[in-house]
């Protein structure tokens, strides 16, 4: 599987990064263990990349333990959730977990999960407005704008 091959790709510098930056987007299966997630994050970090864990609100290991989520951030990972989860479009539990991440200042990025714009219309504006209302404008600016711009700066795009 790709996850098993990840350390080899990273060591050979053949893994696709975000916009040519040092950031690597990691995605896991819903039931992957905390140990598995921790090992993958460690592998990415040990190869000099900066891991962003995508859809962190979908994984049982992170949702059931904000402490584990905090440990991942302490290791050097950044956490990303989907805007629809923040807005409560999927489950109440996902929305609650997203709120906990924001209150603990663990959330790094918000994504649209819009692989195409016909069937999954991005709702970033509504998400930014919601976060701004709940957490303040500066916080919303950081997770919706400043942190993503950090990736582009790292890639030399700006």
Predicted ranges, named:
Residues 52-54, 80-82, 109-112:
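Active-site neighborhood of phospho(di)ester-bond hydrolases with catalytic His/Asp-centered motifs
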Residues 58-62, 86-89, 115-119:
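Active-site environment of divalent metal-dependent phosphoester hydrolases
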Residues 80, 94-95:
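A C-terminal functional module that forms or caps the active site or interfaces directly
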Residues 106-122:
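Short acidic/histidine-rich active-site segments
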Residues 124-158:
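Mid-to-C-terminal alpha-helical segments outside catalytic/metal-binding sites
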Residues 76-88:
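His/Asp/Glu-enriched short active-site or ligand-binding loop at hydrolase and phosphoryl-transfer sites
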Residues 91-94, 136-137:
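Glycine-centered helix-coil hinge/cap
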Residues 1-78:
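Extended substrate/RNA-proximal surfaces in nucleic-acid metabolism proteins
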